[in-house]
C-alpha cells in the first residue's frame, strides 16, 4: 500500500486517498502513511455507539479503531503537517434525532478534520411516492465515474467504475495498453456518451446501480462538515 501511494504521488497524481476501517492503523503504519504523501484518509465509523458499531463491523473493535484514529491525528498534528486530510463517515440510521445527529458530528470532529453523513433509506419503502419507480420515468442522472476515474485490479484490468467489483465493464489492461490509451479508448468514450445521452440503463452493470437509482435526488443524501481549522 505504501509503495503504491508513493508511486502515485511520484507520477503526479493530485488526489491520492483510500478508505479504511482503521483497525490496522498502528503507530508504525501511521508513520509510513504520513511519509508517503497520502492526501486523504477516509475512515468509516458509521456510529459512535460501540455496541451498534461492533454489530455492523464484525471483528472490528470500536475502542481500538477510535484509539488508532486519535493517535494518527495527534501524530500528524505533532509534525505540523496539513495532510493528509482525515474524514470520518457516519450513517444516518432511521429514527435518528437532531440531537443524536449533532452528537455524532461533534464526536466525529474530535477524530477528524471533516465528517460525512449518509442517510440510510431503503428505496423499496418509498416505491409509492418515489417517481423513480413509476412507469415511464426517465432519469436525468449522469454518472461522474467514467469522466473522473479508473479502477485497476491487481491483475491490471481496468474499469471506469470503482463500484464495478466484478469488472464487468473492463475497458483494457495496463499490461497491454497505457492508461492514456485506455482513457481515450472507444470503450471509455462509449461509456461517456451513454451517460451524457441519458442512456446509462443500456449498460447492464449500470442499469441497476445504486448511484443511479438513489443518488440523483437525495436517496441517500450526503453532506460534509469541516472542522474549524480548515
Where are these regions (language model features)?
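The −1 position to Zn-ligating cysteines in a subset of zinc-ribbon hairpins
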Residues: 139-142, 205
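Radical SAM/AdoMet-radical enzyme domain recognition
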Residues: 1-110, 114, 118
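Short hydrophobic/aromatic beta-strand element in the GNAT-like acyltransferase core
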Residues: 149
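Short, P/G- and charge-enriched loop/turn segments at secondary-structure junctions
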Residues: 134-139, 194-197
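Short, small/polar residue-rich loop motifs at catalytic or cofactor-binding pockets
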Residues: 144-146
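Flexible mid-to-C-terminal extensions adjoining Fe-S/redox cofactors in radical SAM and related proteins
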Residues: 157-158, 163-230
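Flexible glycine/acidic-rich beta-alpha junction loops that bind and position SAM and/or redox cofactors
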Residues: 92-96, 116-132, 165-168
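Short, acidic, Ser/Thr-enriched surface-loop or helix-capping motifs
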Residues: 152-153
